[in-house]
Amino acid sequence: MKKLTEEQILENLGKFYGYITKYIPTGDRQDKLLEFYKGIEVTLAISPASTKLSHHNCFAGGYVDHVNRVVEASLVLDKVWERFGQKKTYTIEELVFSAINHDLGKMGTNEEPFYLPNDSDWHREKQGAYFKINTNMTHMRVADRSLYYLQQANIPVTENEFLAIKLHDGLYEEANKPYYITYSSDVELKCNLPYILHQADLMASRVETQI
């Protein structure tokens, strides 16, 4: 299992906060985001991005490392879509906000983290499952919990951000089909942000299994 040094974890955390202060304008929303993440900073800093070695970033600090990569990939893909003539109906703030918070549902609190170290030798050795989900937490889909946490923290979310976060898993999530497969231009997604965030997340996750 990959291991980050304490210095690398802190560097990634600083980069994460840097995206908030750079791309979310100074004011109430930035303040609330920083306050929220500072309140769960221990869990934020050391959480993995997944439970198994065969999945992406299954190591302490993997969550923030993944989110940072998704932010970077989103900014690059935004330029790619522009290069090919997209009709842009979202802002860079919306793009970065969605990327920062797309997997927020994988967080818990400092007292009740979503991911816990797996205490089963069999699961670690046979399945590479070094972490497990905290079953004390109410079951929700990751995207739903992400939006729930933002609501609980009174952090405003635009329509574009809501849909990007909700749909970031693309067609890997069965519940997203009615949004992506519509058979009618009248009800198709009116913004490219969900597609861009999904592509960024997919690319980051794939690359993370190879580095």
Segments the model singles out, each with a brief description of its role:
Residues 1-125:
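Acidic/His-rich, divalent-metal-binding segments that scaffold phosphate/diphosphate chemistry
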Residues 53-61, 65, 77, 88-210:
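Divalent metal-dependent catalytic cores for phosphoryl transfer on phosphate-bearing substrates
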